[in-house]
Amino acid sequence: MKSRKLLLAILALGLLTTSCYTEVIIDDDFIVESPVNTDQVLQSFDLWYVDINASSADGAVPFLQRAFTVSFDRGVVLANNNIVGIGKTGNGLGIDVGSYATLNGVVEIDHDFDGLWALEVYAVNNTTIELFDPRSRSSYVLRGYQRSNFDYDLVFYDNIDYFLEEYEAWEKTFTSEVGAVNEFDNENFLQFVGGSATFRSSVDAVRTPLVNVQWDYQGTYELFDVANDATLKTLTLDYDFLGNDYFELYVINDSTIELYHVASETVYEFTGRGFIQFAKAEVNTGKMRKKSTRKTMPVTRKRKM
């Protein structure tokens, strides 16, 4: 059984922070639960960040497993399912993925493709709730934020591996004149396969249509955090039977990255091709977030900016 009190007005959970909500009076630690209170709690924050690392679920509720944030807005459920465009899509709230209604301490969500779910709502603290699925006995931890204080950039860099997977391929669009000649000069397309640590690369000519790209190499890749440098990531491409390449990864915008090849001191720019929107379509349900296991690399930035 859950040890936390079911909803219990969630300690008012910020309901007093906005004037458009009715004040909830707490008498000691008991509140008469009602659908109105449940809805007020869900709407008390603009966004709920789905903290996968703190959740005890592994794909049990698909639409929560794939979402970075969810929002509850007057009967409509919105979600940010993509890192590309996060903070911009739907004025920061994401896309419409279904509808919801509230019962006593329960939210019924009718997802456009995942169907109907009745999830129990539990209070963790003033800014955190837990959605519990009694069928699978799994839970998702949601942390509440207003748009004005939500750090979209932090979420972006914390989930940058999903960003790489949100394009069908990355096409090389620039190579610096500075830098030693190396074999990576010949590789013009990269693909990071969703749901795995697999990458593929191609030496096909730039501007080759994606449907015609032939993948010449493949292997495994790994992203690393860098101590004391939140926006710098390092990337290792480990080719099957062919050694590896090591890069510093820089994000220019939602569709452009730079790879700094440390060994040769060459800068490559890649542009994303074929954006994959993890929206509402059944074909996209394969994308699921996992608990982060990314390691921290004890290195310093090598590129001279």
Language-model segments: residues:
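C-terminal motif of bacterial Sec signal peptides marking the signal peptidase cleavage site
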Residues: 16-19
